Design a protein with these regions (language model features):
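Conserved lysine of the Walker
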Residues: 145
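Walker A (P-loop) phosphate-binding loop of P-loop NTPases
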Residues: 142
């Protein structure tokens, strides 16, 4: 039952283009949200024991320590939704003073979009890459900061192997 519910959550989030899934403990229950763009949508409210099992499922699949509920943990996986569909996920958990965990899942969509709107103003940024130093990219969630950085590096270091952390 938990596995099927988890697959359904991931499939729905992927199909509607959600960036994040939130499992948040409240006073007497857990709330499940998805974030699409800048909008966080409440999906439903669930019993704490059911959502604790769901969090345990995702932690197990992502290679995290299932029994550790106090310390923050990070994990990632290619989640098998069935029917040959795999969705890349990044997971983060954190416990509260009551021993309840919250879970945030970042859905890493695989489609590659052409960045045509950056082509006009990209040359000054490319010129700045010739100088050593720290480059700061800022903006709201989902605005393309990481995508821009990867595009700049791919353009600047064509034909070379680049590893990002």
């Amino acid at each position: 039952m938990i596995t099927e519910f988890a697959k359904e959550i991931i499939k729905n989030a992927d199909s509607c283009g959600a960036q994040d899934i939130y499992v948040i403990p409240r006073q007497d229950n857990y709330e499940l949200y998805i974030r699409v763009g800048q909008e966080r949508r409440l999906i439903d409210v669930y019993r704490p024991d059911f959502m604790a099992s769901l969090i345990g499922h995702f932690k197990f699949v992502a290679g995290m320590m299932v029994g550790e509920k106090r310390r923050s943990q990070l994990g990632s996986c290619d989640y098998d939704c069935g029917d040959g569909q795999r969705v890349s996920l990044r997971l983060s958990t954190v416990g509260d003073y009551r021993g309840l965990e919250s879970l945030v899942i970042r859905v890493l969509h695989s489609e590659r979009r052409e960045l045509v709107y950056w082509n006009q103003g990209i040359q000054p940024i490319m010129d700045a890459l010739d100088y050593r130093g720290l480059y700061l990219f800022a903006g709201p969630v989902g605005s393309g900061k990481t995508t821009l950085m990867h595009e700049l590096v791919q353009e600047r270091f064509k034909g070379q192997q680049v590893i990002s952390i």
